[in-house]
Amino acid sequence: MSSGVAARCDAKKLVRSPSGLRMVPEHRAFGSPFGLEEPQWVPDKECPRCMQCDAKFDFITRKHHCRRCGKCFCDRCCSQKVPLRRMCFVDPVRQCADCALVSHREAEFYDKQLKVLVSGATFLVTFGDSEKPETMVCRLSNNQRCLILDGDSHHEIEIAHVCTVQILTEGFTPGAGSTRATGMFLQYTVPGAEAAAQLRLMAGEDASGSKRQAAAWLAAMHKATKLLYESRDQ
């Protein structure tokens, strides 16, 4: 992709919605696959009372809409202003207690795990039915739209085309707290192909530092997968 085309794909614009200022892509198709659309606000006439504590709205008890779920709350139940990066808000926005908790948890992904994904890690990568793995660095592109694999060959997989992600583990019973991520199985569609393609990433057995980096990358990818599925289910 030429630098000019890439710049147009990554271009953003500042828009004002009823919820606040948002920095969104010029073209919707080039948005982050982890993003969420703004919710439809519950109409004022349909919520005469707070949807949390049931307080009746009047001149003193004012009505507020949560910017994440769109429901109506009183000030006491919707007083927190929290960053909401999945909807591209420039400033922290008003959210109800439940939504604020979710947004706080997502902030860790954007502040820490996203940086791990973009930095990348080294894996042994096997494409399709090949029996020979290739040592490659796998990372998330800066615009969050592609997985980039670099080694003797170069591959880019659009996140939007990923259909299955399975984190591979080793250890004792899953959920017992003693397993560790060792790899990832990925299925994705290829434009023009009937069947889905697949690849397997496995952490190498070389330097311990490289293994730790790979484990951190896999943990971050596990969180990213959850956000990806949430965005698709919206």
Swiss-Prot record:
One of its GO terms (cellular component) is focal adhesion. This is Zinc finger FYVE domain-containing protein 21. GO terms for molecular function: zinc ion binding. Residues 107-234 are annotated as: PH-like. PROSITE patterns: ZF_FYVE. Zn(2+) 1 binds at residues 50, 53, 74, 77. Gene3D superfamilies: Zinc finger FYVE domain-containing protein 21, C-terminal (2.30.29.160), Zinc/RING finger domain, C3HC4 (zinc finger) (3.30.40.10). The FYVE-type zinc finger mediates interaction with PTK2/FAK1, and also interaction with PI(3)P and association with endosomes. The C-terminal region exhibits a structure similar to canonical PH domains, but lacks a positively charged interface to bind phosphatidylinositol phosphate. InterPro entries: FYVE-type_Zinc_Finger, ZFYVE21_C, ZFYVE21_C_sf, Znf_FYVE, Znf_FYVE-rel, Znf_FYVE_PHD, Znf_RING/FYVE/PHD. It is found in: Cell junction, Focal adhesion; Cytoplasmic vesicle; Endosome. Zn(2+) 2 binds at residues 66, 69, 96, 99.
